[in-house]
């Protein structure tokens, strides 16, 4: 919608400040540990390859990555204690929120999330309460050049892709079925595209437009609070903000 920005777009522009970098590395390290359960060689473990790519994109030191692989592949045991859990809830203005966590204690994680929601005008809901407002899909980010859209369209005809978005003149996001992530990014590479990032994302099917500054700020405060929790690996919301709003 013209004059509005989705939360997913806002997140792309948020820099990782030094105070949050340590927590980010911890979360990325835990993702690597879990992925390494299936094998320590990235060449034969797509999940591990994906986790390592995310870590490198965030400038995580190679020594941290190697240590996480060693722990997850059986040399430390920590990875075996972690499990993926999904939570759903509502924020101010009817905003729907999906949270993916990696935890060794479900009760602790649920309590932390419930507190973050309640302190910021939202509430933690039951599984399925907002999932119908999202589509879990594969997304691959590639490097593009001015005038390359026609070539991209031709490439996608041969791939299992559902569509694309031009983020600017230098990058584009290709999306497709959830189960087709590995084939999609491999296919793009084979077509000669420079693949930068790839992963699974919760894309919104219905957005909530917020035009009130106070409500918008409350929504962003909630999302920031959720993202700051140690067990949280990703936060998705169907928030759409008026670009004219002046918020922090």
Curated annotation (Swiss-Prot):
GO terms for biological process: regulation of DNA-templated transcription. Pfam families: TACO1_YebC_N (PF20772), Transcrip_reg (PF01709). The keyword DNA-binding applies. It comes from the Bacteria. Its main location: cytoplasm. GO terms for cellular component: cytosol. Keywords: Cytoplasm, DNA-binding, Transcription, Transcription regulation. Belongs to the TACO1 family. This is Probable transcriptional regulatory protein Syncc9902_0542.
